């Protein structure tokens, strides 16, 4: 069976891995998944990520914990294949009053909601992380 929404699968694997206190989670790799993992690392939500170049590339995300609790409290898919959500530069959401981040796909690539606001760009809201 084919996977309908690989980004939602990635977010679910991270959510489930942290709920089960796993050190890392593995998933099939894709450029968009690697870009999301890079943003999550830059924002401090995951410890690290690595791409294993084999016959089938695999992305391994090393999860991050603080005092035994997962750093990621919520990770939620917003725009999905059946219902795309686009926001203009003035409509970009603030997650948890600015404590979390929204990952936005813009014409300049993936960036956080803060970076998109500074660049004066809107785009497709991929997910919320807090």
Swiss-Prot record:
GO molecular function terms noted in the UniProt entry: rRNA binding; structural constituent of ribosome
Pfam families the record matches: Ribosomal_S8
Keywords, comma-separated and alphabetical: Ribonucleoprotein, Ribosomal protein, RNA-binding, rRNA-binding
A single GO BP: translation
Cellular component aspect of the GO annotation: ribonucleoprotein complex; ribosome
InterPro entries: Ribosomal_uS8 (IPR000630), Ribosomal_uS8_CS (IPR047863), Ribosomal_uS8_sf (IPR035987)
Family: Belongs to the universal ribosomal protein uS8 family.
Assembly information from the UniProt record: Part of the 30S ribosomal subunit. Contacts proteins S5 and S12.
Free-text function comment from the UniProt entry: One of the primary rRNA binding proteins, it binds directly to 16S rRNA central domain where it helps coordinate assembly of the platform of the 30S subunit.
Name of the featured protein: Small ribosomal subunit protein uS8
Organism: Shewanella baltica (strain OS155 / ATCC BAA-1091)
